[in-house]
């Protein structure tokens, strides 16, 4: 299997992050998670084709990079994007990833996570701008395997 095909397979499980752009019925909402006192922002994600750069040993290896730019939807509207990168630390696809959610006319939310191939990712919210200038919290990204997924960001009050 070629590097690009392998990168596509890995990236499908990578994150905030990374399959063929496909449209399906979008859904998203913003609500309160009363059990933890956090405000939850939920988005339908349309993953893009990732860009894979093989910088280390040929094939997956330390120093390889994947960059992504995905669309975030709320209802039937695109409300922002998710952009970022993952740097591989070994041939298994274990990666250090970081990204930024940009919500149109609202600001940004920065996040980071350790990536492995499972479709469920746990994110740390590390900051933001605009309406999210004091953003802290955590979140999840779940990939559906069809080029779509769900991003949930739980912001501390």
Model-identified regions with their sequence ranges:
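Targeting-peptide/extracellular-domain and disordered-appendage signature
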Residues: 2-13, 17-157
